[in-house]
Amino acid sequence: MTEDRNFDDIAHKFAKNIYGSDKGEIRQVIVWEELEQLLCAVNGSRKSLDVLDAGGGLAQMSQKLAKLGHRVALCDLSLEMLQLAKQDIEKNGLLEQYRLIHSPVQNIAEHLEQPVDVVMFHAVMEWLADPKPALETVLEQVKPGGAASIMFYNHHGLVYKNVVCGNIPHVLEGMPHRKRFKLQPQKGLKPEEVYKWIEDAGFEICGKAGIRCFSDYIGNREYMGDYKTEDVVALERQ
């Protein structure tokens, strides 16, 4: 039986391996550039916005919004992740901008008094047993005229990654989740399906971007040409 992933058991490892790496840095750079465009579209008057960071984990991205004066409701299933996030938020002097909510995203409506201007739902659906209703619930929290930033693990990218690594039998078997890879998502989502879910919820898709389209396929540097992280970021921006 597949269950929603709770990172209480490996929160510190998650923080180090996912965000404390070149891959994490590249992801944050590209995602932030996309968020800046979203903010310009939603916030022409430059007022403070109400933001929901649904399944926001360590709150790296939403802290950038808080620094701009926006108010953030940070929701996560993992209490350990929330505690780590609180420490970092407090260290950065942003605690007054935050409301921390220990809850699965599926129950977030119980914790919000009113809809929000912006929803961030990043890298959560691939860890859920049933992502579609969770996405629908999150989108229901967006007020008219607001916007949502949705990021998910691309099924096609997962197929390609396994093929490049020579895991062809695994692909032919349907890529069942391997429990020993605790930081590997339970599933990838097919973009065409997610786009339909979003549109069926009454939203117009205003932009799309690939995150780490190249860096995930760069192999062992010992056998490759010389390059720097900045070079990979420049490639991702193309």
Task: Locate the predicted segments by residue.
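A C-terminal cap/extension of S-adenosyl-L-methionine-dependent methyltransferases
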Residues: G207-Q238
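Short alpha-helix
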Residues: P185-G202, K208
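Class I SAM-dependent methyltransferase SAM/SAH-binding core
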Residues: Q60-N107
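Conserved class I S-adenosyl-L-methionine
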Residues: M1-G55, Q60-K64, L84, D88, A147-G174, ...
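A short glycine-rich, Lys/Arg-flanked "PGG" loop and its adjoining helix->strand segment in the class I
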Residues: K132-A147
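A conserved beta-strand element that flanks and buttresses the S-adenosyl-L-methionine
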Residues: M120
